[in-house]
């Protein structure tokens, strides 16, 4: 769809900021050697942003974000497969899940961003999701916590070396809610 943000330049600026660019105090950071941990630029956080869930206000915002992330100048974001799990085309309820699983595959050699305004925020477990960006105002704390729980599910492999059925390798030791 041709969806676009009304304040597209501001949203673009935000995309640049979460990557560590366009920081108003960039000169100060250079002088002091300190820098806040922006999600998509801090090497300590990046491994947990390999598969993220962005919770947006509505279907139009999901499509506008997908379009903006795909724009030619946004080269960083093109390493992520963006899945829009919003609107009638995404299907009802769990029907929105297969495209997400297909994009993630095993989760090791892929990077994904799932855009949603409500679908897949309850009753769904995608072990590879390890971060959620809350990009909307939520009236109910239940909605907030239900969405946050999506990234809290464990991701581990039982018997990773094939020689100890009691051994478990934890692949997702932490998760983040931004």
What kind of region is each of these model predictions?
Residues 77, 81-178:
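Conserved RecA-like P-loop NTPase helicase motor core
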Residues 1-116:
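Conserved C-terminal RecA-like helicase domain
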């Amino acid at each position: 769809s041709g969806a676009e943000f009304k304040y597209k330049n501001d949203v673009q600026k935000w995309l640049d900021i979460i990557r560590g660019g366009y920081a108003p105090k960039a000169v100060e950071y250079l002088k002091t050697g300190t820098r806040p941990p922006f999600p998509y630029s801090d090497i300590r956080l990046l491994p947990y942003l390999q598969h993220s869930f962005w919770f947006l206000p509505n279907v139009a915002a999901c499509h506008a974000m997908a379009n903006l992330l795909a724009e030619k100048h946004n080269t960083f974001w093109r390493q992520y497969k963006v899945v829009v799990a919003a609107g009638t085309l995404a299907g009802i309820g769990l029907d929105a899940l297969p495209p997400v699983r297909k994009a993630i595959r095993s989760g090791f050699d892929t990077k994904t961003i799932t855009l949603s305004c409500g679908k897949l925020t309850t009753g769904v477990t995608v072990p590879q999701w390890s971060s959620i960006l809350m990009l909307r105002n939520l009236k109910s704390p239940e909605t907030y916590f239900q969405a946050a729980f999506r990234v809290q599910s464990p991701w581990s492999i039982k018997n990773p070396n094939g020689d100890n059925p009691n051994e478990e390798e934890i692949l997702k030791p932490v998760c983040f809610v931004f």
